[in-house]
Swiss-Prot record:
Domain of life: Eukaryota
Domain remark from Swiss-Prot or TrEMBL: The presence of a 'disulfide through disulfide knot' structurally defines this protein as a knottin.
Disulfide bond sites: 4-20, 8-22, 13-27
GO biological process: defense response
Entry keyword set: Disulfide bond, Knottin, Oxidation, Plant defense, Secreted
Official protein name in the record: Cyclotide cter-Q
Species annotation: Clitoria ternatea (Butterfly pea)
Amino acid sequence: GIPCGESCVFIPCISTVIGCSCKNKVCYRN
């Protein structure tokens, strides 16, 4: 539930390496 400061509209989240995932076009962590 914490925003990772990254969007995933056109490209996937690079921050998946630190546990972030794409939700509603924004990358979140927990």
